[in-house]
Amino acid sequence: MEKLTILLLVAAVLMSTQALIQSDGEKRQQAKINFLSXRKSTAESWWEGECKGWSVYCSWDWECCSGECTRYYCELW
């Protein structure tokens, strides 16, 4: 009887551990989906004024939609 009780206790601990791990994995997957769906296309970023288009004055690469600031002007992809 004692062995059966211990066996049931171990089984309960293993099942609850598995449930915790599975729940954490689902949360990570959902966070990944949310992150990827929140990204905007280059056209959307340009339209909303979050980046500069081609041949516009710039100082840094990150200012341009193309990501290329050459000689103070945004490059065309």
Curated annotation (Swiss-Prot):
Q: List the disulfide bonds.
A: 51-65, 58-69, 64-74
Q: Which GO terms describe its cellular component?
A: extracellular region
Organ and tissue specificity: Expressed by the venom duct.
Name the propeptide positions. 20-38
> Which controlled-vocabulary keywords does the entry list?
Cleavage on pair of basic residues, Disulfide bond, Knottin, Neurotoxin, Secreted, Signal, Toxin
| Domain of life of the organism encoding this protein | Eukaryota
Give the signal sequence positions: 1-19
Where, per UniProt, does this protein localize?
Secreted
**Entry's Gene Ontology molecular function annotations:** ion channel inhibitor activity; toxin activity
Q: Name one Pfam family in it.
A: Conotoxin
Domain comment, in the record's words?
A: The presence of a 'disulfide through disulfide knot' structurally defines this protein as a knottin.
| Family assignment from sequence similarity | Belongs to the conotoxin O2 superfamily.
Q: What is this protein called?
A: Conotoxin Bt6.6
